[in-house]
Curated annotation (Swiss-Prot):
BP term (GO), one: potassium ion transmembrane transport
Disulfide cysteine pairs (residue numbers): none
A single Gene Ontology CC term: plasma membrane
Gene from which this protein is expressed: kdpC
Cell compartments where the protein resides: Cell membrane
PANTHER family in the cross-refs: POTASSIUM-TRANSPORTING ATPASE C CHAIN, POTASSIUM-TRANSPORTING ATPASE KDPC SUBUNIT
HAMAP family: KdpC (MF_00276)
Keyword vocabulary terms for this entry: ATP-binding, Cell membrane, Ion transport, Membrane, Nucleotide-binding, Potassium, Potassium transport, Transmembrane, Transmembrane helix, Transport
Record protein name field: Potassium-transporting ATPase KdpC subunit
NCBIfam families hit by this protein: kdpC, PRK13998.1
Species per Swiss-Prot/TrEMBL record: Staphylococcus aureus (strain NCTC 8325 / PS 47)
Cited Pfam families: KdpC (PF02669)
Top-level taxon of the source organism: Bacteria
Complex formation: The system is composed of three essential subunits: KdpA, KdpB and KdpC.
Amino acid sequence: MNTIRNSICLTIITMVLCGFLFPLAITLIGQIFFYQQANGSLITYDNRIVGSKLIGQHWTETRYFHGRPSAVDYNMNPEKLYKNGVSSGGSNESNGNTELIARMKHHVKFGNSNVTIDAATSSGSGLDPHITVENALKQAPRIADARHVSTSRVADLIQHRKQRGVLTNDYVNVLELNIALDKMKD
């Protein structure tokens, strides 16, 4: 009988610790020390939330930088079932897969070796918010033409916003870069 009582007490204590106190402590630490990150790293522009630093968006206008292709078409709507309800993830297709090759040809004119790898392939999550600085610099002439500014001005904007990669190439956040373009004075 004593063993059963000890087992029940240990179960209740473990449930309170792991199911209530630990999550409460982690939530408080997150809200106090990492408020921005714990709440989705949201970006506000013109007094409205326009996106998150952590989630890529689909950009199509020529006056904006375009992010990486998305294997899930930037689907973040759980009601829109895409690929059996998956709203994030890579394609898991091999290099020889005909669908992958067709998609890459769609994003890149076949035979054009002047395209960065991140402009032609999706990320592992399918929602990557960053592109390489090299990719951004290759898009700069198109954006400069669309906005009637010099390419060097757009390139300076890219260099000012670049983030250093540790084991990767330098990169920029596409949403932050596009907001900076909109804020740019003529």
